[in-house]
């Protein structure tokens, strides 16, 4: 009698294992499954995200011909991807400050309020970092006036 039950039990066991290892196994209802090694949402409060943001804004200011510094008004979206290091993908709204590029401290610079000097940009940055080597690179940067 054990023979006839063996095949269905074997099929049931194979099905259970296949479901357990499938990418959809850990998915929440209504959300697509997260891929291992794929980009995932990150908090702006994470130290790595903050460092990547500071680096990207610094590089933006270096490349800009504007006499004023810009700084982040709002981080619209932050994602990270673990590779042979970490890729950060940041969508950021930047605002022009009253501080000129000759002023070293950007943290306390207020944003311009005068209409003819006020300027905003929306930027998408990709930053690659290898924290244990202390390296950070701006891989991609696209900005448009907001």
From Swiss-Prot:
Main localisation: secreted
Biological process terms in GO annotation: defense response; negative regulation of blood vessel remodeling; negative regulation of collagen catabolic process; negative regulation of elastin catabolic process; negative regulation of extracellular matrix disassembly; negative regulation of proteolysis; supramolecular fiber organization
Motif extent (Secondary area of contact): 81-85
Pfam family membership, one: Cystatin
Domain of life, source organism: Eukaryota
Disulfide bonds: 99-109, 123-143
This protein's GO CC annotations: cytoplasm; extracellular space; Golgi apparatus; plasma membrane; vesicle
Segment forming the signal sequence: 1-26
Keywords of this entry: Amyloid, Disulfide bond, Phosphoprotein, Protease inhibitor, Secreted, Signal, Thiol protease inhibitor
A GO molecular-function annotation: cysteine-type endopeptidase inhibitor activity
Annotated positions of the Phosphoserine modification: 43
Job of this protein: As an inhibitor of cysteine proteinases, this protein is thought to serve an important physiological role as a local regulator of this enzyme activity.
Protein name (Swiss-Prot/TrEMBL): Cystatin-C
Originating organism: Macaca mulatta
């Amino acid at each position: 009698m054990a023979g006839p039950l063996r095949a269905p039990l074997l099929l049931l066991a194979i099905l259970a294992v296949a479901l357990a290892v499938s990418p959809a196994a850990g998915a929440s209802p209504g959300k697509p499954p997260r891929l291992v090694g794929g980009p995932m949402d990150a908090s702006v409060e994470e130290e790595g995200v903050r460092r990547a943001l500071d680096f990207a804004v610094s590089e933006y200011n270096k490349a800009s011909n504007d006499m004023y510094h810009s700084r982040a008004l709002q981080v619209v979206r932050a994602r990270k991807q673990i590779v042979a290091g970490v890729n950060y993908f940041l969508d950021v709204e930047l605002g022009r400050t009253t501080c000129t590029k000759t002023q070293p401290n950007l943290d306390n610079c207020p944003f311009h309020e005068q209409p003819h000097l006020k300027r905003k940009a929306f930027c998408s940055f990709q930053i690659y970092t290898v924290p244990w080597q202390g390296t950070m690179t701006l891989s991609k940067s696209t900005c448009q006036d907001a």
